[in-house]
């Protein structure tokens, strides 16, 4: 197995760990979490997208914990934070938020061709974040790592990121354009962040040329949806945690959660109906890795910048 190239930042070294063998070495982005954290300082309104439904009625445990932890950190920094996903993926997300004592400010992503424009016009986020959310591949389908379509269960939330990307390329972002639905007018494109671990998630369009060099399956399933800042990690939740650790460095505040909270997050997601995205079993694991493994990673992230040494472990 190849080893990802990382710099001297211990947070990058932790995010580059790949114990589940996802094969991220070829497209890992050193400094990605730090760049995303810097982009999030001063965020006003944040919309977080998560939830990967691997089969009918089976949302996975990777995604909601990362969304809850990152959302809490941003809310503590003064941002307004909301979350959206498919209706079937909302219970694990709500469970994760409750496990941290956070407001469950979530809504089901609507149906319809103009849904993306309508949501962006209504929410007007300054920052749009995707954590472990499928992004369309070159054929327009949504594929899992085995090359099987999951489009039936996952609505096209990535359209918001594509729409934001197109809007940001315009010279005058707020200017109306003929032929666009009324709901698309009058909003400014948010800065976009994507977090993933497999190549088929929102944001991986930013490294599509690298993914094309991987196996034929990876090249086929790779997402074409780009973002302004991409964070790659061995587990997508870890990518979100890495951003929070970097935010802690920037602010000097204890924003990262604790290992004990990590255990509660995974348990809450499982009890709300989430399954391991790889085994599809309803058990307290994420990408085949035990809850204790994830808690250990959180402990190391905290130690990587002295967080736990400053405040001690909380239960």
Residue ranges and their predicted role:
Residues 60-78:
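Histidine-anchored nucleotide/phosphate-binding helix
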Residues 79-88:
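Short internal beta-strands
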Residues 1-45:
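Positively charged, low-complexity intrinsically disordered leader regions
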Residues 95-168:
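An acidic, phosphate/nucleotide-engaging active-site surface
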Residues 78-79, 165-171, 185-193:
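A short helix->loop->beta-strand "cap" motif at the edges of active sites that frequently abuts
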């Amino acid at each position: 197995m190849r080893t990802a190239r990382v710099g001297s930042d211990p947070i990058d070294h932790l995010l580059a760990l790949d114990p589940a063998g996802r094969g991220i070495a070829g497209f890992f982005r050193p400094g990605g979490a730090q760049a995303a954290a810097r982009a999030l300082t001063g965020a006003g309104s944040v919309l977080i997208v998560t939830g990967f439904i691997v089969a009918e009625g089976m949302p996975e445990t990777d995604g909601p914990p990362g969304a809850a932890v990152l959302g809490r950190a941003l809310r503590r920094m003064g941002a307004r934070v909301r979350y959206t996903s498919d209706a079937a993926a909302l219970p694990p997300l709500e469970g994760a938020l409750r496990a941290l004592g956070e407001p469950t400010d979530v809504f089901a992503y609507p149906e319809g061709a103009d849904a993306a424009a309508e949501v962006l016009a209504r929410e007007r986020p300054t920052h749009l974040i995707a954590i472990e959310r499928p992004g369309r591949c070159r054929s327009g389908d949504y594929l899992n790592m085995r090359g099987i379509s999951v489009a039936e269960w996952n609505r096209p939330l990535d359209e918001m990121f594509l729409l934001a990307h197109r809007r940001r390329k315009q010279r005058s972002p707020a200017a109306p354009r003929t032929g666009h639905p009324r709901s698309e007018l009058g909003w400014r494109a948010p800065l976009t962040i994507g977090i993933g671990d497999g190549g088929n998630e929102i944001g991986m369009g930013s490294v599509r040329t690298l993914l094309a060099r991987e196996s034929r399956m990876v090249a086929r399933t790779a997402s074409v949806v780009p973002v302004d800042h991409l964070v790659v990690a061995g587990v997508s939740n870890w990518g979100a945690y890495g951003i929070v650790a970097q935010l802690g460095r920037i602010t000097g505040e204890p924003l990262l959660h604790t290992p004990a909270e990590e255990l509660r997050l995974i348990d809450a997601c499982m009890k709300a109906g989430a399954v391991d995205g790889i085994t599809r079993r309803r058990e307290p694991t994420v990408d085949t890795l035990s809850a204790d493994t994830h808690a250990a990673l959180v402990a190391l992230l905290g130690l990587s910048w002295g967080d736990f040494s400053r405040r001690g472990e909380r239960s």
